[in-house]
């Protein structure tokens, strides 16, 4: 049975981890959200989130976006390539309801899988 946990090893924790992704990212995005990815040598995917107060004013909205993004990643972690991902929330993401945000994330995860297979 596949474990769908979200342990510490699946998170980008230090600024160096984020910088690694920002240096040479593969991008997949919508007007409200961008997912940057870069292959890692760990054999499993990791995720980091950036939801700026400038783009999403209310804390409960930022928390909702982060919670839904983590859940989407947790459920897809075994299908994703071994990459470090940084999810960047843009202006207007707070206007998406939970279903729309989940669908957008699913679409972007699939796009990243295709990008890796294509290269």
UniProtKB/Swiss-Prot annotation:
It comes from Cronobacter sakazakii (strain ATCC BAA-894) (Enterobacter sakazakii). GO terms for biological process: tRNA 5'-leader removal. This is Ribonuclease P protein component. The gene is rnpA. It catalyses: Endonucleolytic cleavage of RNA, removing 5'-extranucleotides from tRNA precursor. PANTHER family: RIBONUCLEASE P PROTEIN COMPONENT. Its EC number is 3.1.26.5. Belongs to the RnpA family. Gene3D superfamilies: 3.30.230.10. HAMAP family: RNase_P (MF_00227). InterPro entries: Ribosomal_Su5_D2-typ_SF, Ribsml_uS5_D2-typ_fold_subgr, RNase_P, RNase_P_CS. GO terms for molecular function: 3'-tRNA processing endoribonuclease activity; ribonuclease P activity; tRNA binding.
